[in-house]
């Protein structure tokens, strides 16, 4: 009997970064990739995921915080692990929120090894 592959939602608006993520993770995980907060929230409301890889800055806005808040407060799967991917330093006023609500962080740019490492680590803790 085949082992089910973990299902990951990737929320990333940069096409180049999407490609890096797909190449790094597609052999090990089932990926659903979206590039905006509306699609992410819709998928999260109607599907179950084993992990969310979330870009904080979507279309030049801090949409990641909104998505993470909705995951933790409103979704049926509020315990889904979330890894924050960002090229920016966290705002001091947001640091505590992210540390309390995210399960991991990966700075951009990242490589395949680092991305696989954090995803595997967070999924093993699940």
Regions found by a protein language model. Name each.
Residues 12:
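Conserved acidic carboxylate
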Residues 15-32, 37:
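Two-component/phosphorelay signaling modules centered on CheY-like receiver
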Residues 33-51:
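Acidic, metal-coordinating helix/loop segments flanking the phosphotransfer/catalytic sites
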Residues 55-57:
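Active-site residues of response regulator receiver
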Residues 63-78:
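Short amphipathic alpha-helix used as the core "switch/output" element in two-component signaling
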Residues 66, 89-104, 117:
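Alpha4 helix (beta4-alpha4-beta5 surface) of REC/receiver domains from two-component response regulators
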Residues 110-119:
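C-terminal output helix
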């Amino acid at each position: 009997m085949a082992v089910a592959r973990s299902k990951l939602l990737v929320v990333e608006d940069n096409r180049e970064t999407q490609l890096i993520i797909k190449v790094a993770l597609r052999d090990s995980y089932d990926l659903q990739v979206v590039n905006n907060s509306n699609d992410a929230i819709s998928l999260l409301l109607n599907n179950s995921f084993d992990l969310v890889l979330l870009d904080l800055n979507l279309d030049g806005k801090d949409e990641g915080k909104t998505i993470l808040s909705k995951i933790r407060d409103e979704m049926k799967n509020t315990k889904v692990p979330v890894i924050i991917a960002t090229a920016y330093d966290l705002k001091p006023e947001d640091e505590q929120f992210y540390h309390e609500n995210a399960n991991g962080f990966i700075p951009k740019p990242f490589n395949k090894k680092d991305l696989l490492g954090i995803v595997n680590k967070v999924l093993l803790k699940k």
